[in-house]
Amino acid sequence: MLTTIVGRACRCDRSTLPAVLFQASSSTAGAISCSSGVASGSTSGGAVTVATGAAWAALGWDTGGSIRIPAALQGLVGFKNTQRLTPLQGAIPLSTTLDTACAITRSVRDAVLLHGVLAARTPQPLARPLRGLRLAVPQTVMVDGLDADVSRAFEHTLAVLRAGGAQIDDIALAPLAELSGLQAQGGFTAAESWSWHRARLLQREADYDPRVAQRIRRGEAMSAADYIDLVHARAHWIARVQAEMAGYDALLSPTVPMVAPPLAPLVDNDKRFFAINTLMLRNASPVNMLDGCALSLPCHAPGQMPVGLMVWGPAMADDAVLGVSLEIEAALAAGLAPATGR
C-alpha cells in the first residue's frame, strides 16, 4: 500500500489530556457539522482534514479516546486497536500503559486497510451476518445521561440491528462504576506523563497549555506504591470485566454521551471545561484501561448532528470488532426497517 503524508494538523499538546480542544497557542477548528461546536481534542485537527476530504485518513494517538472521540463528533470512523498490535517507537508518550497508535478514516473498510499497514499484519475481520450475532449493551455508566440526539441515534441503531436478526442483551458490567475510584489520583496518565514531562514542565511551564499542565501535575503527588497498587488493581479489574463480556461477539455503547458542545462557553470557564472534558472521555476511556479494542462509527440520521456508535471488545478481539463493525455499517447504510421498541 503506497502512503502519502500530506501534512500535520493541529492537535492537543499532549495527546488525550483534553478531550475538548481549545488552545490559546493555536487556532481551533470547529466541528465540520457545526462550526461553533468543538471538534474534540488531540486528533481533532486530523479528524477535520478527513471530514473535509483533505486527507484519506489521519494518524493519531488514543490514550483515552483521542481517536474515537473526534471521529464520533465529526461523523467518521475511529479504530483503537489492541495496544500491543501497533508500534509506539518514535513518539512522545503520554501514558506508556495506555497509548495506542491508530487512525481515523471515513469507513470501516478503510479502517481495516490502514490497521493492516500500521500493525504490519493482514486483518481477518470475522464475516458473520447480523442474524446470529450476540451483542451486549452495558448499562453501568455507558448509557447514563445521554443527550437527546445521542439517545435517539443509539436506540434507532439497536432497533435496526434487532430487525436484522442480531441478539442484543442488556448487561450490568458493574466494574465500570469503579474506574473513577481507581483513577482518583490521576491514574496511569498522570503518573506516566509526569515522569516524562517533569523536567521540561519545571523548566518551561510557559510553553505548556495551562490546562494540560494542570493535569500532568496530578502525577507529582503519586508515590511508587500508589502506582504499583494501580497496576495490580487494573489487572484485577480487567479479569472481572472480561468474565462478564464472555460469550458476546462485541459490546455496543455510545462513543460520546453528547453531540459536539459549543466551544465559546468553554474558553474562559475552567470548571465547565473540565466537566465537559470528563463527560466526553467517560465512555471511551474504559477500553484503554481494559487493554481492549474499539471502533467508533457514525450512527446518526442524515442531516443530524454526528453521533458515534462504539463497538468494543477485550484485548486481541480486533478482528471480531472489525467484522461486527462492517456488518453494522452495512445494516445502517441499507436502512433496515427498525423493530418497534427496544
What residues fall within each predicted segment?
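Short, surface-exposed loop/helix-turn segments at secondary-structure junctions
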Residues: 183, 228-229, 260-281
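Structural helix-boundary/capping segments
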Residues: 52-144, 155-164, 222, 228, ...
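Short glycine/serine-rich loop/turn segments
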Residues: 1, 7, 13-22, 27-101, ...
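Acyltransferase
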Residues: 149-172, 198-203, 227-248, 277
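Small-aliphatic-rich amphipathic alpha-helix that forms the alpha element of a beta-alpha
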Residues: 273-297
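Short helix-loop capping/hinge segments that flank enzyme active sites or metal/cofactor-binding pockets
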Residues: 129-134, 187-238, 296-306
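Short connector loops at secondary-structure junctions
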Residues: 167-185, 216-217
